[in-house]
Curated annotation (Swiss-Prot):
Family per record: Belongs to the MICOS complex subunit Mic60 family.
Source species: Arthroderma benhamiae (strain ATCC MYA-4681 / CBS 112371) (Trichophyton mentagrophytes)
Polar residues bias spans: 61-74, 93-110
Mitochondrial matrix compartment residues: 12-140
Transmembrane parts of this sequence: 141-161
Keyword Transmembrane: yes
Transit peptide interval: 1-11
Record's compositionally biased regions (Basic and acidic residues): 264-301
GO biological process: cristae formation
Keyword tags: Coiled coil, Membrane, Mitochondrion, Mitochondrion inner membrane, Transit peptide, Transmembrane, Transmembrane helix
Gene field: MIC60
Pro residues biased stretches: 120-132
Region (Disordered): 61-135, 200-301
Coiled coil: 367-445
Name of the protein this chain belongs to: MICOS complex subunit MIC60
């Protein structure tokens, strides 16, 4: 009987758990696109896991028909309840000793090394370990058998609480199986419904009339079928199953006016909500007697059986077919209980179960709303995250574009420098070729001139020879002298031609150095030009000494032009004016005072007698404008203190320029003897 009362609770729990799991899966499916980022509903977790355990008594009592309908479906007692048997209750088999070890281990100390200069005898060897006691195989096998049987028996009891088919097999064929299963079911029932047994024990037993015989027809009672129509039964339709009062019971007084099968107000409301469908199936109603009995009006009327109204469909879950099906099943149970004579005993538990069922529906509705709100919130968060990611992506794209633009700009500058260098090399090559062509042309002209002179000489010789012949070899000595003179003249002309070529080449090299110094806007090295001058000068000591006197920094880094020197002097002059009033041991206050006083000082005109800083700067600027760098450097060298310290770099640059110019002038002056010789020979 206790098992029959627990079975419907398992059926209701199975349907409720199936409904909650389906709702949880639907919600998880709707939010699958934020599955990786959302931690609110992780995969594999259903809404049933967050529902609190509820103590319900709506499924405590049922009939054998409901159990027969769900004989192949057995579920845990409730969605939140665990197994009645804890894993700690199962004993573990004792661990056996290793098979390879037949004796207990013994510890033997390692022998110590022999000590020097000792005559003590070695210690005696340790005694052998005692032989192990033989263990009985029979006792071990019996222990394993007992443990295995206990584990199998406990597992059978646990699985019987989960499966109906195994429950029937276990209780029928295993000794004491039914008592063990009923014991654990009763424990589980008392744990879930602690007040149920107390109410049953305290309720007074109804007097039973066992004197009369009650005959039950063959087709009376509750059938396992809820409805015999094509579809499922709907408890919201009007019919005989909506009333537990027999239609054949006579009424007296005011109760006789109303028909026994007239639907109640709740039935009318239910029928208005679900529509006016006609019930095409015939419900089997329990009948205690097929014949109508006549009752006199003087007989006292039996008290009316208190019935429980059916559950109205939940308005918030009308679109959920599983909840509606569960409502129909519960209403069917209520109708069956109302049709029983002992319905008054079950009215309070059924009413409480009805209230719990309605609360469960409201809780499911609230959980669905919360899940929907959480899903909407996660969708908004996902949109915000997407917008943030898009903004970050745009920012990264802009950064990449700016980096690429910088790289392209750098490549452009590099290519431009390469093109400029290549054009400079081309120009240099063209100049060298033009110089080579000019030199070759000059050489050709000199050769032609020499040939012409030789031709003229030969013609003169022929003429003289003819005259001599005509004069019968007169003046032969004079002719020989003239020939010797002509030979000397020819040799001199050859020397003049070689010197002329060397002089021209050296002059071109010196001019190239001058052009390299004056044509560039920025100082550049002129090592190649100096090497050309030195190679053309050969062993000339004057040119070699002049080139050696040049500072290597000058031809390695280049020297500034006159315009650059003047421009830099103006900047240096401003700084010198600011520090003109400073003594040699000036501090921070002196520097600040000198800086302020330099703002109000007037620029003086050039004075030949002034020794102050402003006069020196003015004279130096005038000399620089006239191109006299030597005197300008002498004037700036006359400064003292901070002024001279500030102009130190400028003086160094001017000295390098003067050294280079002086060396070039020396190289040019070395060409003067050759030029004078050329002029002399030309005059001759």
């Amino acid at each position: 009987m206790l098992r029959n009362s627990i079975a419907p609770s398992r059926g209701l729990g199975s349907l409720a758990r199936q409904r909650l799991t389906t709702s949880g899966r639907n919600l998880i499916t709707k939010r699958s696109y934020v599955k990786g980022k959302s931690a609110a509903w992780p995969p594999g977790r259903s809404i049933a896991s967050v529902l609190p355990a509820r103590k319900t008594s709506c499924a405590t009592f049922t009939t054998s028909a409901t159990r027969g309908n769900e004989q192949n479906i057995r579920s845990p007692p409730s969605p939140s309840s665990a197994s009645a048997i804890s894993p700690e209750g199962i004993s573990k088999p004792a661990s056996s000793s290793p098979a390879g070890q037949t004796s207990p281990g013994s510890s033997v100390n390692s022998p110590e090394p022999p000590k020097a200069q000792t005559s003590a005898p070695p210690p005696p060897p340790p005694p052998p370990p005692p032989a192990p006691k033989a263990k009985g195989r029979f006792g071990r096998s019996l222990l394993y058998l007992v443990l295995t049987a206990g584990v199998a028996y406990a597992g059978g009891v646990w699985f019987s609480l989960r499966s109906d088919n195994f429950h029937d097999f276990f209780t029928e064929y295993v000794p004491y199986g039914e008592e063990a299963v009923l014991y654990f079911e009763e424990l589980d029932f008392r744990r879930r419904f602690p007040n149920a047994t107390r109410h049953i024990n305290t309720r007074p037993a109804a007097p039973r009339d066992e004197g009369e015989k009650v005959t039950i027809p063959s087709k009376s009672g509750v059938s396992w079928k809820v409805a015999e129509n094509e579809g499922t039964s709907d408890v919201t339709h009007k019919g005989r199953h909506m009333s537990a009062v027999d239609a054949e019971v006579p009424r007296t007084g005011g109760d006789a006016k109303s028909a026994p099968n007239k639907p109640t107000t709740e039935d009318k409301k239910d029928s208005e909500k679900t529509g006016s469908k006609k019930d095409e199936s015939k419900e089997r109603v329990p009948v205690t007697d097929t014949k109508k009995s006549t009752v006199s009006l003087d007989e006292p009327r039996k008290p009316a059986v208190a019935t429980v109204a059916s559950i109205e469909p939940l308005a918030s879950l009308q679109d959920d077919p599983i909840i509606q099906e569960l409502t129909k099943i519960v209403n069917g149970l209520i109708a069956v209980i109302n049709a029983d004579e002992s319905a008054s005993k079950l009215a309070a538990p059924i009413a409480k179960a009805k209230d719990d069922f309605l609360k469960l529906g409201e809780q499911i509705s609230s959980i669905k709303k919360e899940a929907h709100a959480a899903a909407q919130e996660e969708i908004k968060n996902a949109h915000k995250e997407f917008e943030r990611s898009a903004t970050e992506l745009v920012r990264r794209i802009d950064e990449v574009r700016s980096e690429e633009a910088a790289e392209y700009r750098e490549e452009f500058e590099t290519e431009r420098e390469k093109l400029a260098n290549s054009y400079q090399e081309k120009i240099k090559t063209e100049v060298e070729r033009a110089n080579a062509v000019a030199e070759q042309r000059l050489r050709n002209e000199l050769v032609e001139q020499a040939i012409e002179l030789n031709r003229k000489f030969l013609s003169d010789v022929d003429t003289l020879v003819e005259k001599e012949r005509q004069g019968r070899f007169s003046k032969l000595s004079e002719l020989s002298a003239q020939v010797a003179e002509l030979e000397k003249l020819t040799a001199g002309w050859n020397e003049v031609i070689g010197a002329n070529l060397t002089t021209q080449q050296l002059q071109v090299a010196v001019d190239a150095v001058h052009s390299a110094l004056e044509s560039e806007s920025m100082p550049r090295p002129f090592i190649n030009e100096l090497l050309a001058v030195k190679s053309l000068a050969g062993q000339d000591p004057i040119v070699n000494a002049a080139i050696s006197s040049i500072n290597p920094t000058a031809y390695q880094r280049g020297i500034p032009s006159t315009a650059q020197i003047i421009d830099r002097f103006r900047r240096v002059a401003n700084e010198v004016r600011k520090a003109s009033l400073l003594p040699e041991d000036a501090g921070v206050a002196s520097h600040a005072t000198s800086y302020l006083m330099s703002k109000v000082m007037f620029k003086k005109e050039a004075s030949s007698s002034g020794d102050d800083v402003e006069s020196i700067l003015t004279r130096t600027e005038k000399l620089l404008e006239q191109g006299n760098l030597d005197d300008a450097a002498r004037e700036m060298n006359a400064l003292r203190g901070w002024s001279k310290l500030l102009s130190k770099d400028w003086l160094a640059d001017v000295r390098r320029v003067l050294e280079v110019r002086q060396a070039l002038e020396v190289c040019f002056l070395s060409l003067l003897p050759t030029l004078s010789l050329l002029i002399y020979y030309n005059e001759c």
